């Protein structure tokens, strides 16, 4: 595993952990998403600065794009409203959709595979299939130009 790949994988895990926590206690009372991130035990235990910065970039990007990401997830999760999707799966879907749509340097296949790895680690037995189905449909539409962005599969 290359150093960049390992850093990004660990960064995704860290971003996922904080994003998942935010699904229970969203920013409120003067606490910004960034402040919560900086105070998160998972972040304060981490010593690798590049990893912390990458996870922070992901989290803040996801948080600022959450409405659009939820619209995309809702469009591709047939018969599943956002409110019905389990918090683990929703956090993984938001993270992966963000990478698929906004991170030009992450190939579509890599974004999907990394989401499946998160689902294997944190989800239940059905998580990976559910996540793969949604993300594969999103990636196909990105690949065919429906999202007005250009990426490699």
Where would I find each of the regions flagged by the language model?
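N-terminal interaction/assembly modules
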Residues: 1-122, 126-153
């Amino acid at each position: 595993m290359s150093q960049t790949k390992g850093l990004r994988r660990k960064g995704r895990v860290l971003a996922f952990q904080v994003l998942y926590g935010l699904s229970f206690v969203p920013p409120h009372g003067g606490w910004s998403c960034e402040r919560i991130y900086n105070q998160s035990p998972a972040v304060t235990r981490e010593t690798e600065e590049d990893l912390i910065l990458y996870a922070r970039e992901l989290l803040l990007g996801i948080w600022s794009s959450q409405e659009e990401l939820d619209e995309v997830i809702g469009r591709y999760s047939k018969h599943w409203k956002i409110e019905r999707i389990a918090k683990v799966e929703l956090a993984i879907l938001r993270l992966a959709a963000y990478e698929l749509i906004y991170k030009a340097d992450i190939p579509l296949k890599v974004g999907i595979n990394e989401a499946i790895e998160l689902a294997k680690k944190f989800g239940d037995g059905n998580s990976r299939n559910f996540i793969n189905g949604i993300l594969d449909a999103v990636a196909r539409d990105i690949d065919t130009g429906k999202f007005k962005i250009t990426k490699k599969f």
